[in-house]
């Protein structure tokens, strides 16, 4: 079977408009992109915000980096063990942690969060997303949406690496430091692979100086001030 060429793929517009979807949910969708080092508090803040939004009657969903890597962006072993993919397919479609795979990881979730937000949900994405160009690409995906630009709110979880290492809930920093000391690189963000901090995030929160409640209030106030959420 011949490969389908890009010129043979066309966008198919439905009859339901985005305004109609958003009116049904009584809210305008948006993506809130939480980025920061491992252990910085991204998921903690995103989950807490999701709970508050739900309690206030808003539809929201957290897309967590670890959770997504157990399915959509799983690595070859997980795909073979839990999805019964053949080894060749698993290696072809599975994602590891090379710079190229990290780029594809963020590209995929950028597309998924765009779909969620386009449907009217608040998509709360919690990913290290260490490379600035990948985050910029995710923003561009939202800005160039076929049915009109979708709000993309970047939230920099600016917790110092010292605090992240003290927490180290998964023991990854120690593992990475030990690997580097032994002359073996792990490509772990913040240790032997760079984290490129956002230059102009919409919001910034530091878990070493602010509580989760303060972080939630910071984001919630931003959403209220800009009309995404009622006061």
Question: What are these model-predicted stretches?
Answer:
Residues 1-31:
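Extreme N-terminal, non-catalytic leader segments
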Residues 34:
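Hydrophobic anchor at the beta1->P-loop junction of P-loop NTPases
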Residues 38:
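The conserved Walker
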Residues 42:
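Conserved lysine of the Walker
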Residues 47-114, 118:
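Conserved substrate/cofactor phosphate-moiety recognition/catalytic segment
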Residues 114-121, 141-150, 195-198:
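Conserved catalytic network of the ASCE P-loop NTPase/AAA+ motor domain
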Residues 125-126, 130, 145-167, 205:
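Conserved phosphate-donor/acceptor-positioning beta-strand/loop module used by diverse small-molecule
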Residues 158-161, 166-218, 226-231:
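Small-molecule kinase domains that catalyze NTP-dependent phosphoryl transfer to phosphate-bearing small molecules
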